[in-house]
């Protein structure tokens, strides 16, 4: 039997999603340990998209296979009670055997939140990035539109990125201000390592006036990571979740 889970987590205390063995706690390892405890047998999960250390997840989707019979609500509640308080399973649904959390997804969504004021955050320091320079969100939004469509995003991926190629389709990019907080929301078919944070880092330079609006298009065309902006800090980034065709009968928040 195959199940899909919707998982929410605060990534502050984790080295990232992926379980790499030694080196500190991961979200994946914590989830697999809790699921295995409920099943009383080892279980492994496959996720829709891995996140880095300090990055959060609002509705990460995973799937797992098991012969153990449990009600979906029992999987959800039983697993959550065994997880650290920074991770929760929001829902559990049975899915077809050919559903795949990663390969069945048609899009993925991220949001980056940035506090734009002179004084750094205290209460939300783990869920907000910070920029003391005044930023023009309209300039950032206009500049970001140059990235829409299918492009080679080599200028916006990390040097450690192991993807075979840098072509991705960015379906939407919106920059908006809500009081002192600027939000950058993106949706694409897939993302490269550090791609969202590198885009945000470059947009900040445009928003501050240090770089012209046209600079983002020049970076995209030049495909040179070394001349782009710095990688924005991880704490401002949330993986909102993937999107799937409606034939998989998943909750509305992850359905196209």
Curated annotation (Swiss-Prot):
Keywords: Isomerase, tRNA processing
Positions annotated as active site in the UniProt record: 52
Origin superkingdom: Bacteria
Enzyme class per UniProt: isomerase
Signal peptide: none
EC number(s) on file: 5.4.99.12
InterPro entries: PsdUridine_synth_cat_dom_sf (IPR020103), PsdUridine_synth_TruA (IPR001406), PsdUridine_synth_TruA_a/b_dom (IPR020097), PsdUridine_synth_TruA_C (IPR020095), TruA/RsuA/RluB/E/F_N (IPR020094)
Cited SUPFAM superfamilies: Pseudouridine synthase
Sites where the protein binds substrate: 110
CDD domains associated with the record: PseudoU_synth_EcTruA
GO biological process: tRNA pseudouridine synthesis
Annotated GO MF terms: RNA binding; tRNA pseudouridine(38-40) synthase activity
Catalysis performed (reactions): uridine(38/39/40) in tRNA = pseudouridine(38/39/40) in tRNA
Subunit structure comment from the entry: Homodimer.
Family membership: Belongs to the tRNA pseudouridine synthase TruA family.
PANTHER family named in the record: PSEUDOURIDYLATE SYNTHASE (PTHR11142), TRNA PSEUDOURIDINE SYNTHASE-LIKE 1 (PTHR11142:SF0)
Job description of the protein: Formation of pseudouridine at positions 38, 39 and 40 in the anticodon stem and loop of transfer RNAs.
Protein name: tRNA pseudouridine synthase A
